[in-house]
């Protein structure tokens, strides 16, 4: 165990990662050294920032807590604290089941944790978080919470009502990060497309995106977690006309059959979904759409699932993720539906869906062979420089693999023009041409 060292372990989504980065800056401001590598935890203080979204994430969080409890018993770490979504949702249960943890805190309890340790909380440090990502890119969380009421989702229970961050705060944070070398920003929120309604009485996502794109030094802005119902169409001209706003949109659609959309309480129809996608692709030529779909929601029939498969074949999403339904306590589903789809059926449908998407992804990538694309280099690994295009977000999307060439050294964080020379379903191969 190392004195004056804090280890922060982050589980779950990029929004959780931002929370950890804010907390890490508070520890640094109080004179601690801070580490974010779960493989080398040995601190005087360990904080596990948990995820509580669905069953698999909850299990991973509990297992991580138990691993840290064993490390504490063995003397490899000192105090152990747990916070985040799982702790926000199940704090009393966790206290009973795992009492070895020194204290449990909710998702937004940074001040309480710092106060418990007898340290000072520096409000001015909230916009100076300690990045855990490579310096050239960062996640920018523009709001907290969610006002939607999707049947399956526990996020509003955990995070509360939607709360936009003031636009000036976001602009200032991006300016500060640019000064320190950040060039690429992923805009994230539980619901990106609700931004501004609470603060300004109107949707202001388009204005925010435009203002951020005006900041000198911002190379790429990428939009994540849009909601299809009441989509702000004034965003589309901003995406089309501004070169540093990536032609990329992450919009979770979940399903397409009208019976399922109603049961999911998505507030959009099949016809409206097709119309929205056509409008987006018409107004922003070349845009790459990422979506997330679900299999096995209560009541999903074979006919519903076949509609979903046909939807994927029709739209041919450039990027797609999928997961199986998880029955979560406190949700509308929990109160009104039975979890009536066997797990084996959920998994079978998931596999079939992803097999269809793999063929589509392969075709999209093969069509890029011979094209020239701007690439940012993230790292060097196993004989390749590994980078991404504007159509690829970190961690979740394909990568561009550029073989080492004698006399050619590519720098992480730098942008290059590359010619695509080969393709796999989820990765590209390329060579530098500038």
Swiss-Prot record:
[4Fe-4S] cluster 2 binds at residues 146, 150, 153. It comes from the Bacteria. It is an enzyme of class 2 (transferase). Residues 132-363 form the Radical SAM core domain. Binds 2 [4Fe-4S] clusters. One cluster is coordinated with 3 cysteines and an exchangeable S-adenosyl-L-methionine. It holds the Pfam family UPF0004. Coiled coil: none annotated. [4Fe-4S] cluster 1 binds at residues 13, 51, 85. The keyword Transferase applies. GO terms for molecular function: 4 iron, 4 sulfur cluster binding; aspartic acid methylthiotransferase activity; metal ion binding; protein methylthiotransferase activity. It is found in: Cytoplasm. It catalyses: L-aspartate(89)-[ribosomal protein uS12]-hydrogen + (sulfur carrier)-SH + AH2 + 2 S-adenosyl-L-methionine = 3-methylsulfanyl-L-aspartate(89)-[ribosomal protein uS12]-hydrogen + (sulfur carrier)-H + 5'-deoxyadenosine + L-methionine + A + S-adenosyl-L-homocysteine + 2 H(+). Residues 4-122 form the MTTase N-terminal domain. One of its GO terms (cellular component) is cytosol. This is Ribosomal protein uS12 methylthiotransferase RimO. It comes from Porphyromonas gingivalis (strain ATCC 33277 / DSM 20709 / CIP 103683 / JCM 12257 / NCTC 11834 / 2561). The lineage of its organism: Bacteria, Pseudomonadati, Bacteroidota, Bacteroidia, Bacteroidales.
């Amino acid at each position: 165990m190392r004195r004056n060292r804090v280890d922060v372990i982050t589980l779950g989504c990029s929004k959780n990662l931002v929370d950890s980065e804010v907390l890490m800056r508070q520890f640094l401001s109080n004179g601690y050294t801070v580490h974010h590598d779960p493989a080398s935890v040995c601190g005087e203080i360990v904080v596990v920032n948990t995820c509580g979204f669905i069953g698999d994430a909850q299990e991973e969080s509990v297992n991580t807590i138990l691993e840290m409890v064993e490390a504490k018993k063995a003397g490899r770490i000192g105090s152990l604290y747990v916070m985040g979504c799982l702790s926000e949702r199940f704090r009393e249960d966790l206290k009973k089941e795992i009492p070895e943890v020194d204290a449990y805190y909710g998702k937004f309890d940074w001040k309480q944790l710092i106060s418990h340790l007898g340290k000072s909380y520096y409000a001015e440090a909230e916009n100076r978080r300690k990045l855990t990502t490579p310096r050239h890119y960062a996640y920018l969380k523009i709001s907290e919470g969610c006002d939607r009421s999707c049947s399956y989702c526990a996020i509003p229970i955990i995070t509360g009502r939607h709360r936009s961050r003031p636009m000036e705060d976001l602009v200032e944070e991006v300016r500060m990060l640019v000064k320190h070398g950040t060039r690429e920003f992923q805009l994230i929120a539980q619901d990106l497309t609700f931004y501004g309604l609470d603060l300004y009485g109107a949707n202001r996502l388009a204005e925010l995106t435009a203002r951020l794109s005006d900041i000198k030094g911002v190379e790429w802005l990428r939009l994540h977690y849009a909601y299809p119902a009441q989509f702000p169409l004034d965003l589309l001209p901003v995406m089309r006309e501004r070169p540093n706003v990536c032609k990329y949109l992450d919009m979770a659609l979940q399903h397409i059959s009208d019976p399922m959309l109603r049961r999911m309480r998505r507030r959009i129809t099949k016809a409206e979904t097709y119309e929205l996608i056509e409008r987006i692709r018409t107004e922003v030529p070349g845009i790459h759409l990422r979506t997330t779909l679900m299999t096995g929601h209560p009541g999903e029939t074979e006919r519903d699932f076949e509609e979903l498969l046909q939807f994927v074949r029709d739209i041919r999403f450039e990027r797609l993720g999928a997961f199986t339904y998880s029955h979560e306590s406190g949700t509308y589903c929990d109160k009104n539906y039975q979890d009536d789809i066997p797990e084996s059926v959920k998994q079978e449908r998931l596999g079939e869906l992803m097999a269809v998407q793999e063929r589509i992804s392969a075709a999209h990538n093969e069509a890029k062979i011979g094209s020239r694309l701007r690439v940012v280099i993230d790292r060097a690994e196993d004989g390749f420089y590994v980078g991404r295009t504007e159509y690829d977000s970190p961690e979740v999307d394909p990568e561009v693999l550029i073989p080492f060439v004698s006399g050619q050294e590519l720098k992480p964080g730098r942008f290059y023009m590359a010619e695509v020379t080969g393709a796999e379903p989820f990765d590209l191969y390329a060579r530098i041409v500038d």
